[in-house]
Amino acid sequence: MTISVARGVVMPRHLAIGGAHRHAAGMATIAIYSLKGGVGKTTLAVNLAWCSATRSARRTILWDLDPQAASSFLLHGTAGRDQAQAMFSRDISVAKRAQPTPVAKLDLITADASLRGLDQLFHTLDKKKRLGKLIGALTDYDRVLLDCPPGLTETADQVMRAADLIVVPVIPSPLSQRAYEEVIRHLGGKVPVLPVHAMVDRRRRLHADALAANPDWPVIPMSSVIEAMTVQRAAVGAFAPRSTAAAAFDQLWRTIEHRLAAGSAAD
């Protein structure tokens, strides 16, 4: 049996969740990643972390690995001066870097500008599973979500080795689809991927055609309430719980939890 992950790309069902990536009993790592920037990656990361903590009552931590620190801003994180990279090169407890957020059961590890040098640091350290080892120390959490910087970099490779599931936002456009297929080729079937149509306007012919080509992909709509996150500094479900966007994030999170549960059963 196989499950389709992209048109022309399939993944064996036994890879529905990468059991080999599990760090502790019950813990799962979910990376939100895209080769391209500007596709709604941080929006997904914050809303999925909120759903994990509130809808599933999971002990959740969002680790912001993007030097732009957008997730850190949205969740009211307090970043130290150029400290985010230090956890990777020094003997610093990653758990002690966790900060509470205004959301119960949701903690945050903030980003800062020092992460711009993270790729070079990984090359220097030559430790292929450094990120995975640090995640493994987060034993107080059920779900670890990673807001990843764009690009096929050493940081991306570290993420791919550590993740149980990679969520990839894809804008309904040929360029975004092409970037997604490049990610699939790079992974080579080693890590399960969940593509998500993001920033969707069903009135646009291009978007409608893309959705028709991949009808099984979850869909996150283009929405003014999502844009309002930067003003509210909160997940959509916190300030617009009855919105279409909030329902879409809830449904996406249920899909993710189902995948994780199916993977645990297969293990």
Model segments located where?
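P-loop/Walker-type NTP enzyme "switch/lid" segment
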Residues: 55-139, 226-234
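Conserved catalytic-core segment of NTP-binding enzymes
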Residues: 30, 56, 60-61, 139, ...
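Walker A/P-loop phosphate-binding motif and the immediately C-terminal alpha-helix
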Residues: 26-67
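Short histidine/acidic/glycine/proline-rich micro-motifs that form metal-
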Residues: 36, 115, 174, 199-202, ...
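Alpha-helical elements of Rossmann-like donor-binding domains used by nucleotide-donor carbohydrate transfer enzymes
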Residues: 47, 86, 130-133, 182, ...
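Active-site signature of alpha/beta-hydrolase-fold catalytic machinery across serine-
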Residues: 47, 51, 74, 158
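C-terminal lobe/tail of nucleotide-utilizing enzymes
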Residues: 4-24, 189-267
